[in-house]
Amino acid sequence: MGIGLIVYVTIGLSCHSKACLQHFEEVIETTPEVTECHTITGAVEYLLRVEVTDIKSYKKFHTDVLGTIPSISSITSLLVMDTTKDLRVQV
């Protein structure tokens, strides 16, 4: 099965202690669907790039991974409909 769906996900946290941040990052580092994780400025703390086969797979990731991290206070999912330009190296 290939990648059929790319989702950019913003994550807001309710806890900003070192332990909360480390726990979030440890979970994300061990999750294969997450291909990028960026700490960002603004109203939320993280921006993730998630690559899955379909919307059903994304729902499973949303529930089984993000849904198990107690410090997450907000999740916004942005589904990529089409890509006009992508200069990243393709493997």
Named regions from a protein language model:
Residues 1-91:
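A compositional/biophysical signature of low hydrophobicity enriched in polar/charged and small residues
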